[in-house]
């Protein structure tokens, strides 16, 4: 199996771990899935060649991942994101041709524990049936993505447990404790150190088999989709209250992320989260927080099997778990900071509870029309102009380390964005001055698209 360790391959092929989760899968279905799995290597190599998506050879895009069509159908409030060059599904649904996200109940038989400690589908990846999961996943993907040539974002949102043992702290510690109980029950005479070592190994290998195997199946069925997991990689730079907060990812986190090479190698896109916690309000630490989270994603992407893998951070327009919309400066610290580092784009996620009232829908529309939309036009236009001016239209502009505060935004002395009120896109007026070009050349450099090279991305070749 492509991308799996020997132990994970064994996990993949072995019979279901837990009899309680396998009755729903007929022998014919399981056998069909296993026959499909034997073709993965060939098909995945083919998928690598066939890849092409909504982000191909575009310097920066924004993708809408919010069900704001509800605002129109229920309250008559039209939150039109398309006029600001935001990619969205038809009727702005969570699942569609441009963007599909799978939550744990929507893809296969993901094992997890409830808040009260009850196991669902076996609870642990090493105690659940991967064959049963893939049989259900096969059907779920076909139902959610009926078009075989789907070329949008394909995001899997699994948050109950993390594939590295060391990252399962606090409420996720139950996955470590139950893993050790599983080993202890089989080997009651083993010392605690040996039990933990075996439990750690079993959990991590099974987690790899589940996560990599699910990606592989998606990539075989919809090879042009940008398959990846929400929230990966993480940086865990949440010590905001520290007086000398730098935002840097702890060394042990980077070391653990290095052990997830199988995940970065298997992903067709990386979707780190840069949601701004409420604790960052008024602290002036948001940019440092976002900067290092994006840097970590770019770091693991560059050393992966495909250094061109798109990085698409997830952004919220609200401070996390609040009803406070981000002010313009925080959009600069999140969307703007991401664009300046040369990511392929960003996903704008909106919780469904934000569209539950007419008032909240009206607030989102006003924010989109007055603040978010114009800023997206600004950043998207600046990224395109910089790509054409510096990178021959064949690469993205990436901020030079010597100018850590530089953002990819238009010079207001050279450009103006004129908003309309009749449903038409805003108009951008102006041209790059010689000074603008000189500033870009000083503060940014090029990261070439696949198939281009050279300082200015003007030469063919990898």
From Swiss-Prot:
Protein name (database record): Hyaluronidase-1
PANTHER family, per the entry: HYALURONIDASE (PTHR11769), HYALURONIDASE-1 (PTHR11769:SF23)
Active site per the UniProt annotation: 159
Gene Ontology MF term list: chondroitin hydrolase activity; hyalurononglucosaminidase activity
Signal peptide from the UniProt entry: 1-52
Reactions the enzyme catalyzes: Random hydrolysis of (1->4)-linkages between N-acetyl-beta-D-glucosamine and D-glucuronate residues in hyaluronate
GO BP terms, alphabetized: carbohydrate metabolic process; cartilage development; cellular response to fibroblast growth factor stimulus; cellular response to interleukin-1; cellular response to pH; cellular response to platelet-derived growth factor stimulus; cellular response to tumor necrosis factor; cellular response to UV-B
EC assignment: 3.2.1.35
Top-rank taxon, per record: Eukaryota
Gene: Hyal1
Disulfide bonds: 71-361, 235-249, 386-397, 391-446, 448-457
Tissue: Highly expressed in liver, kidney, lung and skin.
């Amino acid at each position: 199996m492509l991308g799996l360790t020997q132990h994970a391959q064994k996990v993949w092929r072995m019979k279901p771990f837990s009899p309680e989760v396998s009755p729903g899968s007929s022998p014919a279905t399981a056998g069909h899935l296993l026959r499909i799995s034997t073709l993965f290597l060939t098909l995945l190599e083919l998928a690598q060649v066939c890849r092409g998506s909504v982000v191909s050879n575009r310097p920066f895009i924004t993708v809408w991942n919010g069900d704001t069509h509800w605002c129109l159908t229920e309250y008559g409030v039209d939150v039109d994101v398309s006029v600001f060059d935001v990619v969205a599904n038809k009727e702005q649904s969570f699942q569609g041709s441009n963007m599909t996200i799978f939550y744990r109940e929507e893809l296969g038989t993901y094992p997890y524990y409830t808040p009260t400690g009850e196991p669902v589908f076996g609870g642990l990846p090493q105690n659940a049936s991967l064959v049963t999961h893939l049989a259900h996943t096969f059907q779920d993907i076909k139902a959610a993505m009926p078009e075989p040539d789907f070329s949008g974002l394909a995001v899997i949102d699994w948050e109950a447990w993390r594939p590295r043992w060391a990252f399962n702290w606090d409420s996720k510690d139950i996955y470590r404790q139950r893993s050790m109980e599983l080993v202890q029950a089989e080997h009651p005479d083993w010392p605690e150190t040996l039990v933990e070592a075996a439990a750690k190994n079993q959990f991590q290998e099974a987690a790899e088999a589940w996560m990599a195997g699910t990606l592989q199946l998606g990539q075989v069925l919809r090879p042009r989709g940008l398959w990846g997991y929400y929230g990966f990689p993480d940086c865990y730079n949440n010590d905001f209250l520290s007086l000398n907060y730098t935002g840097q990812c702890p060394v042990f986190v980077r070391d653990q992320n290095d052990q997830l090479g199988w995940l970065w190698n298997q992903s067709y896109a990386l979707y780190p989260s840069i949601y701004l916690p409420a604790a960052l309000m008024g602290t002036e630490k948001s940019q440092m927080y976002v900067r290092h989270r994006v840097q970590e994603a770019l770091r693991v992407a560059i050393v992966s099997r495909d250094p061109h893998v798109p990085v698409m951070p997830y952004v919220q327009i609200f401070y996390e778990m609040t009803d406070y919309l981000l002010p313009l400066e925080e959009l600069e610290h999140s969307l703007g900071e991401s664009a300046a580092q040369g990511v392929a784009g960003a996903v704008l996620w909106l919780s469904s509870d934000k569209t539950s009232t007419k008032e909240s829908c009206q607030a989102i529309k006003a924010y989109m029309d007055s603040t978010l939309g114009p800023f997206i036009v600004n950043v998207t236009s600046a990224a395109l102009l910089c790509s054409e001016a510096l990178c021959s239209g064949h690469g993205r502009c990436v901020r030079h380390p010597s100018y850590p505060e530089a953002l990819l935004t238009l010079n207001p002395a050279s450009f103006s964005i004129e908003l309309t009120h009749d449903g038409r896109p805003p108009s951008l007026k102006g041209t790059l001055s010689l000074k603008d070009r000189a500033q870009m050349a000083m503060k940014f450099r090029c990261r070439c698209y696949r198939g281009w090279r050279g300082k200015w991305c003007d030469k063919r070749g990898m």
